[in-house]
Amino acid sequence: MNNMILGRYIPGNSIIHQLDPRGKLLSMFLFIFLLFWANNLQTNLLLFGFIFVLMYLTRISVSFYVKGLKSMIFIIAFTTIFQLFATSQGTILYQWWFFKFTDQGLAQAAIIFCRFILIIFYSTILTVTTTPLSLADAVEKILTPLKIIKVPAHEIGLMLSMSLRFVPTLVDDTNRIMNAQRARGVDFGEGNLLKRIRSFIPILIPLFASSFKRADALAIAMEARGYKGGEGRTRYRSLQWGVKDTLALFIVLCVMGLIFYLKNG
């Protein structure tokens, strides 16, 4: 749990920190499209190169981002292995009992693995360089045109901000509860898989209780400050779109064009 870094903001003055959060979000959406386009070795290598350049520009150690993968390693491994054996087309490379994996299954599993790594890296870059409040403002600004069809842009942005804000808090609460259970003699790594799952049940009840308590305290605090929704609200800092934001978005579009060329070339 200590390896969970997604949702944590790290203050800094890098060029990525200075970019408008609207541009970062738009780039995130474009990057997701790129992940589905990247279906061969060349395109995935290009995306990894692009991600490592972004990591360097954030002035945050690459090892920090790699550390964040540890909390997701089980999901990544399970999905990759499932994809490996779920694809039956292609030449059979190995078979045992009714399990078999093929060259196409291996290729698909590698692509799924790369997609997981890339999306986690990019999401982490977004959250460590952008405050939750800025992300909420960006979501609200992007969704503002949809207000004409009654889409609650402000409320969606507020929910996103609160969700990102409380991810590190929930992780810290989980660590605190697990340490308290260990002090009472609980071993979370002992026994078979079913026993290990059962050992986590005593964590869930106090974690849920703590979450509801925090949510109730937050609701009371918002009511005490007269919060009544987004209508008529002003901001202390307004978002400013600059030349570097346009340039950054243009670079992402160029990478998208190059991916499309390599995919169909």
How would you name each of these model-derived features?
Residues 1-41, 47-56, 144, 148-151, ...:
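Transmembrane alpha-helix interface motif
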Residues 13, 36, 59-64, 96, ...:
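Membrane-helix interfacial "entry" motifs
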Residues 24, 63-73, 248:
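Alpha-helical transmembrane segments and their helix-start/interface "positive-inside/aromatic belt" motifs
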Residues 37, 41, 45, 57-64, ...:
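Membrane-interface elements of multi-pass transporters and channels
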Residues 50-60, 74-78:
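Alpha-helical transmembrane segments and their membrane-interface exit regions
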Residues 72-186:
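Juxtamembrane/interface alpha-helical elements of multi-pass membrane proteins
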